[in-house]
């Protein structure tokens, strides 16, 4: 999810019927879908580096195949403003354990933020529906995974399709921590942007994600959250679920997510990884595994919404990676120091501490341990 200095806002439960500005690839096999999406990106993207080929591949749907016959499949869905790069590491980890893994690109993403002005939740759902069905035709057992908004989308699909074997939910955006997100559907037509685009201060995008999103993007995020909560209220979800959240997430109502896990995700083999101070529920619930998220030896003040996904070895987002996110809710002089390559600490959006410059935490020091917990859940 993208942050704004201005409050994000709104709730109407009917979906907008707007058409996307971009032509969507038709329903096809995955290889054709990927090639058509690559062409769409190439035609519409505002490239951020001189290496257009790399940017195309980073933003396009990906597939990882295991050695030998796959024992199952996993479809992974990114979040608002993100791209398939979100699963660069997790995809490889799962494929190494025998799964065929695929990612999708949600409409409006991977090109330029303006292309989200008219996108709809229904279009996002269509991509998930088509590619989940395609994967189900190819392997006997399919799991779905999602990050943030993507977690809402796969939860919705799983509630409608009992053949889905389980879920992997990374920072699931069941409920925002903003009291105003419900307003965004009402104001998107009069205020297309919550943060003015191209203001000379706030970057619009990086090679792999947007840093500014139209109001309509937040509106569709809101709709997906409402839908996820409706599904959870419908009935408990009884398949194995792996979930991971951080206490200091600047996007989510993490207490609501924790309570949802304890009350609605009932499989005894499900696990929730919680980064932060051990929640009160953890001692009573062996399914909740807590780890400290203050790691001063690594200059980590707190974990972030997005950092849970990435290995420290990630070539873009690791501590030695090429994509340091300095737009992190701090004063402009601190942002300039970060961009100049000075030593930094890491945090989620908006955290400040005297005498320290904070970049966004974009890697997870517990990645290997977290992956083993995830794989154990898949083995249920």
How would you label these PLM feature ranges?
Residues 105-110, 173:
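Short beta-to-alpha linker loops that shape the active-site pocket of alpha/beta-hydrolase fold enzymes
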């Amino acid at each position: 999810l993208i942050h704004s200095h201005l409050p994000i806002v709104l709730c109407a439960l009917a979906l907008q019927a707007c058409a996307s500005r971009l032509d969507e690839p038709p329903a096809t096999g995955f290889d054709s879908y990927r090639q058509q999406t690559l062409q769409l990106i190439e035609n519409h993207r505002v490239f951020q580096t001189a290496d257009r080929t790399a940017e195309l591949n980073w933003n396009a749907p990906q597939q990882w195949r295991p050695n030998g016959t796959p024992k199952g499949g996993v479809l992974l869905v990114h979040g608002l403003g993100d791209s398939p790069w979100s699963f660069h590491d997790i995809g490889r980890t799962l494929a190494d354990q025998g799964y065929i893994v695929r990612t999708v690109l949600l409409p409006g993403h991977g090109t330029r933020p303006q292309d989200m002005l008219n996108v709809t939740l229904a279009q996002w759902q269509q991509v998930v529906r088509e590619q989940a069905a395609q994967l189900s035709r190819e392997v006997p057992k399919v799991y779905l995974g999602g990050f943030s908004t993507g977690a809402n989308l796969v939860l919705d699909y799983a509630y409608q399709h009992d053949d889905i074997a389980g879920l992997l939910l990374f920072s699931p955006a069941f409920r925002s921590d903003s009291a105003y997100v419900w307003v965004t559907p009402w104001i998107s037509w009069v205020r297309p942007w919550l943060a003015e685009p191209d203001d000379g201060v706030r970057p619009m995008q990086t090679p792999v994600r947007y840093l500014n999103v139209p109001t309509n993007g937040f509106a569709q995020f809101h709709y997906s959250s409402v839908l996820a909560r409706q599904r959870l209220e419908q009935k408990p979800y009884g398949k194995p679920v792996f979930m991971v959240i951080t206490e200091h997430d600047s996007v989510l109502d993490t207490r609501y997510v924790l309570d949802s896990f304890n009350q609605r995700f009932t499989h005894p083999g499900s696990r929730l990884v919680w980064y932060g101070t051990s929640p009160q529920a953890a001692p009573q619930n062996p399914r909740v595994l807590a780890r400290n998220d203050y790691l001063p030896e690594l200059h980590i003040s707190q974990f972030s919404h997005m950092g849970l996904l990435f290995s420290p070895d990630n070539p873009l987002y690791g501590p030695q990676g090429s994509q340091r996110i300095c737009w992190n809710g701090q004063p402009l002089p601190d942002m300039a120091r970060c961009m100049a390559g000075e030593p930094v600490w890491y945090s989620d959006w908006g955290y400040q501490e005297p005498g320290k410059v904070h970049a966004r935490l974009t890697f997870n020091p517990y990645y290997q341990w977290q992956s083993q917990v995830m794989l154990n859940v898949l083995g249920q």
